[in-house]
């Protein structure tokens, strides 16, 4: 049986999710936590998909201007880790995205999935990394039963073009497909 990985404790407080990306990334770096997104499931044990999604919605809702939200997503994409080239394979590519986008699942023995993500375009990378973070450290059943309407709080209709919105829905379909797998 595999030994459960011990996680580093994070000096966490509720204000962290409303901090600027740079501030959160600095805290993560100071605590030697790498390859983690600002609202990360890797140090938020017990947070549900809905909790993490709501954290991102709160971050985006602090910005009145849609251009600020768009810029935040692109900055988030820039600061997010990249998927190693060896995983940029057709089987991990998300169909229906305007730019090449990869979503790589990492299944645990505890029936939990972690995701890593990348894209050739910054706005797509910001979205796919945010979704990867929201769904990481979740059970297959929680992922498979996620309701698409819960994304409404992200206000994608005003934020993204129809083509990019379709790409986000394709990303979610791929994520839910991994959650539905029986192997």
Regions from the language model: what does each represent?
Residues 45-88:
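Extended low-complexity intrinsically disordered regions
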Residues 127-139:
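Alpha-helical support elements that line or immediately flank enzyme active sites
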Residues 2-10:
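Short Lys/Arg-rich cationic patches that frequently serve as NLS/NoLS or arginine-rich RNA/DNA-binding motifs
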Residues 12-44, 57:
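Intrinsically disordered, low-complexity regions enriched in acidic/Ser/Thr/Pro/Gln residues
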